[in-house]
Structures are given as structure tokens and as C-alpha cells.
């Protein structure tokens, strides 16, 4: 049987590069704006510097060569990784040089982590608070100490070594970024080979990465943690490599190591259940997930992802073509299904980035919610300041990524979308139905907003009139979250039937016993009531409004009834003018601008809810079976009115930051004050128009001309878009700084 291999060979994946495509030239670095024909002419007005910052990374704004754009993005990724490695190296160096890590290891439940000691130049050493065991420094809330313990680091030398390793990796990343742009740059077809990319990312990054971490945990981290849990001093624990070369060290901790690989090859895997466990719940000694459960999880994940890395067809006869999967997705044959989407994601990096940002942002929010209910690192659950910081951090990261997804989806629609190539496919049909989608989503927002705020306004009114029996509360008119309670109940009750070998559910948050360390609550069942029901509908309202703004921006980014030729105006433009009133703030960029404010609204309420709820109903102490929470359970009684949120959360809990002056928390008081100023400063840009500032500038320039000190670069007021960008940046920076200082001063004081 003859086989024609000519076409098959054409389909083979080849790694193709251009050698020495772009010479290394440092002279261009000295010429700001060299990448743009207009900017390279130099500044005539002050607008030039703003345009320089706005456009410097807009690779496809000054080039239409997709291959060159792809190479620049690829190279920039290595640069980003290099910066991350330097940052991480700095964290580890601080841990080695300036921290109380070894003291913290000896008593992590009582001693607070610190890795920064402020120098006494003119009294700044007031910031060095007593974190325990005689160490004075700034308390940190990054969770790094807990990660280091979980990974088996026991001394400063190991931290130093890792810091040096981080710098070596940073150098390799910077070198790779230069090498793959200037010396051996991949061709476009390499960037567009989705199957190979997915296979390598699934098997390599996720599969082998998880396998490596599982191996590290089993052979090094868990044995060291077992010894620490038994009270062995960190200085007496064998060095990591000793567990690898001396088998008796491992056999003393895990007897199954004596049997070697025999149980593996004879499929008698249960023999390994001493280090690959399936216990569920939290370790009562450390308040974290069982490290042996985590190792088991990573081993299972590794197997799944290594298999998943063989799903997509490349040079071998197994797997599927992504294009065929997408084009085969025809539902009831009413449309072309997903045809055209493969071409979109392999030619528009904005479309691909949008999808990735939406997924990564959602994942970050999922991480935030898992990390407090299922704390992964030893003793992190009783470090309330770290728990609050990490929840807030992951929520913010998720919010910014999701807004970024909307931004890049809009850029794709404006710059990369071709209607002729997408006729009657999934995307086209969504665009055709955009009026129905947006109008219904708008109705949902109005419904949620009016009803959820209506409940609060009713309660505030009844409270003011002294009619507490007519309020929505757990003690009067109840609005119990029955569906949430049902989900909690089944997660707690059905463990015996769904996972008979597990001793506990995934988290005590579902129900069961309190997990406490030295009398301090790590996690316990979280009761939900009327106040939770009410604020959850505020969450639903703000999230839906954020989605409405971003989705409207995407679906109407090319055209609308108001501006049919919007795609010709680009991603960002102030108005469709001059001469057309009522067409301002309709660009896709403006939707991102507005979406950022609503994202801020959404997340502020989420992190406020989290902070108050856990202080009220979870965090605290257990003494002789008597549970005492930080705010003594006042969430249920107070969080059902707007006045309650203002009085018993914002005002009551801000006392620590307001009264922090003269203490080690005084920096938070100054940040609280300064961040309020930054936030207020933003309103100057958001409320006033460009003309006001241009008139003012011209008066100031007139005065300079009189004194013959007029600048060569003519001052110009910010454009409308630039003003909004500066405004939203300061609004968010001020808001985040205010919240950060408010949270930390409060939680460090009561932790």
C-alpha cells in the first residue's frame, strides 16, 4: 500500500527561526520615541511625553508585521520574568538578611513574621514594632514565611542560596529575551502553532511542574515539616540533600520507603499511604491542609496534565486538531458554530490575551476564596493579617485582569476583527443579538440594584423609627440564604457517601468542629444569615454592572446606532466631533475607564464583607470551649443597615489607623492620610474640563513670557482621554492605599 507523505510532511511541526534578524543597537535607546514616526521628531508640546508613555508598548500601533509584533511580545515576556525573578530574589534576600525567620520557625503561632528593619535616621525606627522573642521590625503579611516552612527551608543559608539562584534565573531570562529577538527569533508559524503550545504548557509547565513540586514535597519538604511538628529544633534537622542520599532518614519518617519502588510496579500503591494521604480537612497542629494530602494532590494533578499534554495533534498520529474541535462545535446546525475562532486566536494576540486574562482573573478570585477556607501553608490560618492581605491581594489582581480582558477584547474588535471572515459564526451571532443581551443585562442590574439597596433603605428607615420588629434580620423578618445553606450542608453531610475514605470534608467552613491552635481559631463553621443574603445581592448588583459596562464596550466597539463608523475612530477617542454633541465617552477605552470604577466598587464591598464577617464570626479565641470572636458576632445584627456598615465597620474599625500616630503603626496613619489626598486629587482630573486648564496654562505662560523664561516645549493641557486616565489611576491608587492602611492597622492591632 503506497502512502503519500507529501501533504503529511507539510503538516509536520518544525521549529524555524531567523538567525540574526535584528542587530543589537544601543544608540536607539538614547532617542526617545524611536519606535514612532511622529514621536521620534521630539517634543514640541508637553503632550509628547504623555503620548510617549501611552504608546510605548502599543506594538501593533506602529507596526503591521505580525511576526515582528509576536517576537517583541515574546521577548518582553522574558524581560517580565527576569524582573519577577529579581523581585523574588529580593524577597528571599530580605528573609535571609533582615528577618526573624529562624525565631518564627521555633514558635510560628506566637511570633509574628518580620523581614524589614527600618534604619534610625531621624526617628523612623519607631516603625520597628515588637513582633515577639525580642525582635523589632516591620510585620510583613505576604505569607512568605509560611511558604518557606511548607517548602522545607529551615535556615538563612538556604534563603541566601535561593536568592542567588533567583538572580541567576533573572540573568538567564534577560539573556533569553535578547537571544530570541536579536540572535534566533522564531518565525510566525511557531507562534501560531497552538497544538504544540498547549501540549508543552499542559505536560511541561503544569504536568512536570506539579510532578516536580510533589517530588520536592515528598523527599524534602514533608520530612522536614514532620520533624518541625515533633518539636525538633530547626538547627538539628538534617540538610535537604541528606534526605536524598541517606535512605534511613526517610525510612524513620515514612516506613514505606524501605520497600522502594516495588509497590509502584506491583500496583500495590496503598503501601505509599503514609506519605500520599487522603485525609481531608485541616491538620489540627498547623491549621493548614495536610501536606501529605497536598503532595498526593500534586501527584494526581501531574498525571492528569501529562496525559492532557497529549491531547492535541502535532507530528504523531494521536490527538486532535484544535481547528477541527472548534469547527465541529455546531449546535443543532443553526449556525457555523465556532468556525473562524481558530483563525481569530492564532492571528489576534489581543483576542488570545483577552481570553487568558479573563481565565487568570477568575482563577485569582477562586484562589482568594480557597486560601482562607482551605489554608495551604502551616500556621498561615492563625496569622489573620496575612489572611486578610492575601484575600484582598488576590481579589484586586482578579479584578484588574478581568477588566483587562474587556480592554483587549475591545482592541481585538476594533483592530483585528474582520466581519467578512466571521459571517454567521458564534461571534457574529452574539454581535447580532447585542441589543437583546445588553438590554436584558441592564434590566438585571436595575432589578438587583433597586431591590438590594431597597432592603437596606427599608432597614435603615425602620431602625431610625425604632421599629426593629419590622426589619429584615435573623431576629425579625428573616431572609435566610437557603441555597447557600443547602450547599454548605451537602458539602458537610455527604462526605461519608461521596468520599468514604476521607475523615473530614474539604474545609471546616462547611460545618463540623472548630480548628484552633493554642486557643486561636484557624477555621470553623461559617454561619450565613440575613445580613449575608443582603450583601451578597449587593455583590451580584455591582458585578453585573461591571460586566454590563465591559460587555457593552466590547459589543459596541466597532459601531452603534449613535456612531455607525466607530471602528474608524479607533480604540480610544474623546468624542465623534467636532459638531456632534452627545457622542463623548463612547469609545471602547471609555468603557474600560468606567469599568475600572465599578470593579473598584465591586471589590471594595467584597473585601469589606470578608474582613468584617471573619472578624465577627470566625477569627478569635477558644477558652474552655467558650468562643470569643474579635467583634463578638456583631455582623448579623449590624450589617443589615447602611448605617451599621458605616458605624460598626468603617468608623469603629478605623480607630486603630486614626490613632496610630506615635506607634509602630504610624506609617499606616500617614498612608491613610496621604492616600485620601491622592484619591481626592483624582477628582480634580475627573470633574473639570480640558478648557479650564488650557485657559489657566495660557495665563501662566503669559507671565513666563513677561519674565522671558518661557519654556521651549509649549505647555498643553491634558487631552480629555489623558485626563481621565490620570484621574482613574489616582482614584484607584488612593482607594487601594486607603483600604490597605485601614485594614492592616486594624488587623495587626487585634491579631
From Swiss-Prot:
Subcellular location: Plastid, Chloroplast thylakoid membrane
Residues the entry annotates as binding phylloquinone: 693
Cofactor note: P700 is a chlorophyll a/chlorophyll a' dimer, A0 is one or more chlorophyll a, A1 is one or both phylloquinones and FX is a shared 4Fe-4S iron-sulfur center.
Positions bound to [4Fe-4S] cluster: 575, 584
GO process annotations (BP): photosynthesis
Binding site for chlorophyll a': 676
Gene Ontology molecular functions: 4 iron, 4 sulfur cluster binding; chlorophyll binding; electron transfer activity; magnesium ion binding; oxidoreductase activity
Catalytically driven reaction(s): reduced [plastocyanin] + hnu + oxidized [2Fe-2S]-[ferredoxin] = oxidized [plastocyanin] + reduced [2Fe-2S]-[ferredoxin]
PROSITE patterns assigned to the protein according to its UniProt record, in alphabetical order: PHOTOSYSTEM_I_PSAAB
Primary localization class, coarse: plastid
Membrane protein topology class: Multi-pass membrane protein
Assembly, per entry: The PsaA/B heterodimer binds the P700 chlorophyll special pair and subsequent electron acceptors. PSI consists of a core antenna complex that captures photons, and an electron transfer chain that converts photonic excitation into a charge separation. The eukaryotic PSI reaction center is composed of at least 11 subunits.
UniProt family annotation: Belongs to the PsaA/PsaB family.
Reported function: PsaA and PsaB bind P700, the primary electron donor of photosystem I (PSI), as well as the electron acceptors A0, A1 and FX. PSI is a plastocyanin/cytochrome c6-ferredoxin oxidoreductase, converting photonic excitation into a charge separation, which transfers an electron from the donor P700 chlorophyll pair to the spectroscopically characterized acceptors A0, A1, FX, FA and FB in turn. Oxidized P700 is reduced on the lumenal side of the thylakoid membrane by plastocyanin or cytochrome c6.
Protein name, UniProt field: Photosystem I P700 chlorophyll a apoprotein A1
Biological source species: Bigelowiella natans
Amino acid at each position: 500500500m503506497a502512502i503519500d507523505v507529501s501533504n503529511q510532511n507539510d503538516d509536520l511541526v518544525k521549529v524555524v527561526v531567523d538567525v540574526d534578524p535584528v542587530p543589537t543597537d544601543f544608540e536607539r535607546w538614547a532617542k526617545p520615541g524611536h519606535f514612532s514616526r511622529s514621536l521620534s521628531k521630539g517634543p514640541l508640546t508637553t503632550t509628547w511625553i504623555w503620548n510617549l508613555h501611552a504608546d510605548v508598548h502599543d506594538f501593533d500601533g506602529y507596526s503591521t508585521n505580525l511576526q515582528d509584533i509576536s517576537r517583541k511580545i515574546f521577548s518582553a515576556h522574558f524581560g517580565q520574568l527576569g524582573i519577577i525573578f529579581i523581585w523574588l530574589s529580593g524577597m528571599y534576600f530580605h528573609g535571609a538578611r533582615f528577618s526573624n525567620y529562624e525565631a518564627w520557625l521555633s514558635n510560628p503561632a506566637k511570633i509574628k513574621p518580620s523581614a524589614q528593619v527600618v534604619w534610625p535616621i531621624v526617628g523612623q525606627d519607631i516603625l520597628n514594632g515588637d513582633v515577639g522573642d525580642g525582635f523589632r521590625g516591620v510585620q510583613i503579611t505576604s505569607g512568605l514565611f509560611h511558604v518557606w516552612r511548607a517548602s522545607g527551608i529551615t535556615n538563612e543559608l538556604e534563603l541566601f542560596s535561593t536568592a542567588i539562584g533567583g538572580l541567576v534565573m533573572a540573568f538567564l531570562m534577560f539573556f533569553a529575551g535578547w537571544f530570541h529577538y536579536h540572535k534566533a527569533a522564531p518565525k510566525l508559524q511557531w507562534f501560531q502553532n497552538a497544538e504544540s503550545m498547549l501540549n508543552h504548557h499542559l505536560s511541561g509547565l503544569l504536568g512536570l511542574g506539579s510532578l516536580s513540586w510533589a517530588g520536592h514535597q515528598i523527599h524534602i519538604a514533608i520530612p522536614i515539616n514532620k520533624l518541625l511538628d515533633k518539636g525538633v529544633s530547626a538547627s538539628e534537622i538534617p540538610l535537604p540533600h541528606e534526605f536524598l542520599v541517606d535512605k534511613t532518614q526517610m525510612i524513620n519518617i515514612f516506613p514505606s520507603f524501605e520497600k522502594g519502588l516495588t509497590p509502584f510496579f506491583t500496583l500495590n500503591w496503598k503501601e505509599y499511604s503514609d506519605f500520599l494521604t487522603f485525609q481531608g480537612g485541616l491538620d489540627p497542629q498547623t491549621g493548614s491542609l495536610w501536606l501529605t494530602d497536598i503532595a498526593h494532590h500534586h501527584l494526581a494533578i501531574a498525571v492528569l496534565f501529562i496525559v492532557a499534554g497529549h491531547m492535541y495533534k502535532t507530528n504523531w498520529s494521536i490527538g486532535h486538531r484544535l481547528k477541527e474541535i472548534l469547527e465541529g462545535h455546531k449546535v443543532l446546525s443553526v449556525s457555523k458554530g465556532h468556525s473562524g475562532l481558530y483563525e481569530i486566536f492564532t492571528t489576534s494576540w489581543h483576542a488570545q490575551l483577552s481570553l487568558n486574562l479573563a481565565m487568570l482573573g477568575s482563577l485569582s478570585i477562586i484562589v482568594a476564596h480557597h486560601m482562607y477556607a482551605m489554608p495551604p501553608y502551616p500556621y498561615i490560618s492563625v496569622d489573620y493579617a496575612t489572611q486578610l492581605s492575601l484575600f484582598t491581594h488576590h481579589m484586586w489582581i482578579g479584578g484588574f485582569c478581568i477588566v483587562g480582558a474587556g480592554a483587549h477584547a475591545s482592541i481585538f474588535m476594533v483592530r483585528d476583527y474582520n466581519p467578512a471572515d466571521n459571517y454567521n459564526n458564534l461571534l457574529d451571532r452574539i454581535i447580532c443579538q447585542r441589543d437583546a443581551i445588553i438590554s436584558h443585562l441592564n434590566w438585571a442590574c436595575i432589578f438587583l440594584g433597586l431591590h438590594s439597596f431597597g432592603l437596606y433603605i427599608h432597614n435603615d428607615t425602620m431602625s431610625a423609627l425604632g421599629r426593629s420588629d419590622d426589619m429584615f434580620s435573623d431576629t425579625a423578618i428573616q431572609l435566610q440564604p437557603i441555597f447557600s445553606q443547602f450547599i454548605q450542608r451537602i458539602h458537610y453531610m455527604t462526605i461519608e457517601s461521596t468520599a468514604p475514605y476521607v475523615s473530614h470534608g474539604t474545609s471546616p467552613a462547611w460545618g463540623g468542629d472548630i480548628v484552633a491552635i493554642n486557643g486561636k481559631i484557624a477555621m470553623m463553621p461559617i454561619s450565613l444569615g440575613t445580613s449575608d443574603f443582603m450583601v451578597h445581592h449587593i455583590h451580584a448588583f455591582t458585578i453585573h454592572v461591571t460586566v454590563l459596562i465591559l460587555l457593552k464596550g466590547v459589543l459596541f466597539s466597532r459601531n452603534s446606532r449613535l456612531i455607525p463608523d466607530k471602528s474608524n475612530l479607533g480604540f480610544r477617542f474623546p468624542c465623534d466631533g467636532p459638531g456632534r454633541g452627545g457622542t463623548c465617552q463612547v469609545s471602547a477605552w471609555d468603557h474600560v475607564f468606567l469599568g475600572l470604577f465599578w470593579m473598584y466598587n465591586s471589590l471594595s464591598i467584597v473585601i469589606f464583607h470578608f474582613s468584617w464577617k471573619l472578624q465577627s464570626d470566625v477569627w478569635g479565641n477558644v477558652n474552655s470551649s467558650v468562643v470569643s470572636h474579635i467583634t463578638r458576632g456583631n455582623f448579623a445584627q449590624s450589617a443589615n443597615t447602611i448605617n451599621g456598615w458605616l458605624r460598626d465597620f468603617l468608623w469603629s474599625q478605623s480607630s486603630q489607623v486614626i490613632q496610630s500616630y506615635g506607634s509602630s503603626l504610624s506609617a499606616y496613619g500617614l498612608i491613610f492620610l496621604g492616600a485620601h489626598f491622592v484619591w481626592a486629587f483624582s477628582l480634580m482630573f475627573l470633574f473639570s474640563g480640558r478648557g479650564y486648564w488650557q485657559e489657566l496654562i495660557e495665563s501662566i505662560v503669559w507671565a513666563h513670557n513677561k519674565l522671558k523664561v518661557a519654556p521651549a516645549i509649549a505647555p498643553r493641557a491634558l487631552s480629555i482621554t489623558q485626563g481621565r486616565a490620570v484621574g482613574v489611576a489616582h482614584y484607584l491608587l488612593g482607594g487601594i492605599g486607603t483600604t490597605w492602611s485601614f485594614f492592616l492597622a486594624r488587623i495587626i492591632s487585634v491579631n
